[in-house]
Swiss-Prot record:
It holds the Pfam family Gag_p17. This is Gag polyprotein. The gene is gag. Belongs to the primate lentivirus group gag polyprotein family. It comes from Human immunodeficiency virus type 1 group M subtype B (isolate RF/HAT3). Late-budding domains (L domains) are short sequence motifs essential for viral particle budding. They recruit proteins of the host ESCRT machinery (Endosomal Sorting Complex Required for Transport) or ESCRT-associated proteins. p6-gag contains two L domains: a PTAP/PSAP motif, which interacts with the UEV domain of TSG101 and a LYPX(n)L motif which interacts with PDCD6IP/AIP1. Keywords: AIDS, Capsid protein, Host cell membrane, Host cytoplasm, Host endosome, Host membrane, Host nucleus, Host-virus interaction, Lipoprotein, Membrane, Metal-binding, Methylation, Myristate, Phosphoprotein, Repeat, RNA-binding, Viral budding, Viral budding via the host ESCRT complexes, Viral nucleoprotein, Viral release from host cell, Virion, Zinc, Zinc-finger. A motif (LYPX(n)L motif) lies at residues 484-493. The keyword Lipoprotein applies. A motif (Nuclear export signal) lies at residues 16-22. One of its GO terms (molecular function) is structural molecule activity. A lipid is attached at G2 (N-myristoyl glycine). One of its GO terms (cellular component) is membrane. Residues 73-77 are annotated as: Interaction with membrane phosphatidylinositol 4,5-bisphosphate. Residues 217-225 are annotated as: PPIA/CYPA-binding loop. The lineage of its organism: Viruses, Riboviria, Pararnavirae, Artverviricota, Revtraviricetes.
Length: 501
């Protein structure tokens, strides 16, 4: 990181950190943005040391600008960062990224006007820096500098490793900057495998060449001396034109950029190949339950690159499906951020979702909610008087059960008072038996503390009419007991009543 961070130092670093990312925004550029730009340039096989000078930044901008229309959001962010860094190197005062882009556009327009004016004054197109790899030698002649083996090796390695994934297109655009049709054919011929894809590319090129011939018919009559013939579709593709003719068209006044036209046809064919090699639709990209949000975003934008749609449609897809296809945890966070949240804010908010710390935090919140609800219910008195009252079936007292009762065990059923079965097998649906073994209170007759039967006397007692018969006191008492207590006799429980003797 130290080498990357040494791009700016001192006063330039202070200027860099004062520039805002967006107009009237809160976030400003930091050192980490330079580190990120260096890593992105390494991905595109561009030397990151070019960021250290203004001329190097200008070269990077020249390579990235043609791919802005079809590039991803990361490519646009890289272009914006390099443009802002160029203004810092040139000591151009800017307040935000938009002002830096406006300054770059003004400078490019001025340089184009100067080049056109110089070409009109001198009568030749000596725009050396605009037409690399076509350079001017010491004799003032425009010559072609062949594409380097290092560039070809980088292109072949990308095709072998990526196999026409979406990032192949910006890589091809960067490596073929300013190339002639002959250079482009050399790059295509170095691809050994994937011949089916190469055949599809040839068909696309032939279709575009036929469309060019239809839109640019040949003018009748001879060609004026000193003028070049107009290129046909096959000339642009490099099959019926020589290298000198290609250089002549590209350096003529006005120039015909046959290299850029052919490059555009190739990129159109590569888009079709990428679509074939990446059959996954953007609708199928969904975040897994344990997948980090960063990996999900990488897969999303990689698939979005392969979509054959305009930039407006891609922006709508990003705003809609990026949040909609996230997992429930991330979706809850993203919806809370609102629709105006930036990608950086989304990734920061969803950082760590699905990991151990996030799960522990969710569990703690759930436990806190349960504890709070339980406390509220206790405060409301929902658990008041919930304790069950225990009563003994043996003695009838409260506070213990029959198993722990110290009183003598009552015989028979505790419910109906009859012997021969237990209470659990009792079929009597009445009330529980009292200590006498009888059901009380009885639904028939008088209460237990009243005399059960008391016949009204209609004549004098019987003994008054029995003259000569004597009855003992014990017989008299038994007779009284039977009359007073026909259902239950206390004598059976306590023997003879002493009070009656």
């Amino acid at each position: 990181m130290g080498a990357r961070a040494s791009v700016l130092s001192g006063g330039k670093l202070d200027k860099w950190e004062k520039i805002r990312l967006r107009p009237r925004g809160k976030k400003r550029y930091k050192l980490k943005h330079i580190v990120w730009a260096s890593r992105e340039l390494e991905r595109f096989a561009v030397n990151p040391s070019l960021l250290e000078t203004a001329e190097g930044c200008r070269q990077i901008l020249g390579q990235l600008q043609p791919a802005l229309q079809t590039g991803s959001e990361e490519l646009k962010s890289l272009y914006n960062a390099v443009a802002t860094l160029y203004c810092v190197h040139q000591n151009i005062e800017v307040r935000d990224t938009k002002e830096a882009l406006d300054k770059i556009e003004e400078e490019q327009n001025k340089s184009k006007k100067k080049a056109q004016q110089a070409a009109a004054d001198t009568g030749n197109g000596s725009q050396v820096s605009q037409n690399y790899p076509i350079v001017q030698n010491l004799q003032g002649q425009m010559v072609h500098q062949a594409i380097s083996p290092r560039t070809l090796n980088a292109w072949v390695k990308v095709v072998e490793e990526k196999a026409f994934s979406p990032e192949v297109i910006p890589m091809f655009s960067a490596l073929s900057e300013g190339a002639t049709p002959q250079d482009l054919n050399t790059m295509l011929n170095t691809v050994g495998g994937h011949q089916a894809a190469m055949q599809m590319l040839k068909e696309t090129i032939n279709e575009e060449a036929a469309e060019w011939d239809r839109l640019h018919p040949v003018h009748a009559g001879p060609i004026a001396p000193g003028q070049m013939r107009e290129p046909r579709g096959s000339d642009i593709a490099g099959t019926t034109s020589t290298l000198q003719e290609q250089i002549g068209w590209m350096t003529n006044n006005p120039p015909i950029p046959v290299g850029e036209i052919y490059k555009r046809w190739i990129i159109l064919g590569l888009n079709k190949i990428v679509r074939m090699y990446s059959p996954i639709s953007i609708l199928d990209i969904r975040q897994g339950p344990k997948e980090p949000f960063r990996d999900y975003v990488d897969r999303f934008y990689k698939t979005l690159r392969a979509e054959q749609a305009s930039q407006d449609v891609k922006n709508w897809m990003t705003e809609t499906f990026l949040v909609q296809n996230a997992n429930p945890d991330c979706k809850t966070i993203l919806k809370a951020l609102g629709p105006a949240a930036t990608l950086e804010e989304m990734m920061t908010a969803c950082q760590g979702v699905g990991g151990p710390s996030h799960k522990a935090r969710i569990l703690a919140e759930a436990m806190s909610q349960v504890t709070n609800s339980a406390t509220i219910m206790l405060q409301k008195g929902n658990f008041r008087d919930q304790r069950k009252i225990v009563k003994c079936f043996n003695c009838g007292k409260v506070g213990h059960i029959a198993k722990n009762c110290r009183a003598p065990r009552k015989k028979g059923c505790w419910k109906c008072g009859k012997e021969g079965h237990q209470m659990k097998d009792c079929t009597n649906e009445g009330r529980q038996a009292n200590f006498l073994g009888k059901i009380w209170p009885s639904h028939k007759g008088r209460p237990g503390n009243f005399l059960q039967s008391r016949p009204e006397p209609t004549a004098p007692p019987e003994e008054s009419f029995r003259f000569g018969e004597e009855t003992t006191p014990s017989q008299k008492q038994e007779k009284i007991d039977k009359e007073l207590y026909p259902l239950a006799s206390l004598k059976s429980l306590f023997g003879n009543d002493p009070s009656s003797q």
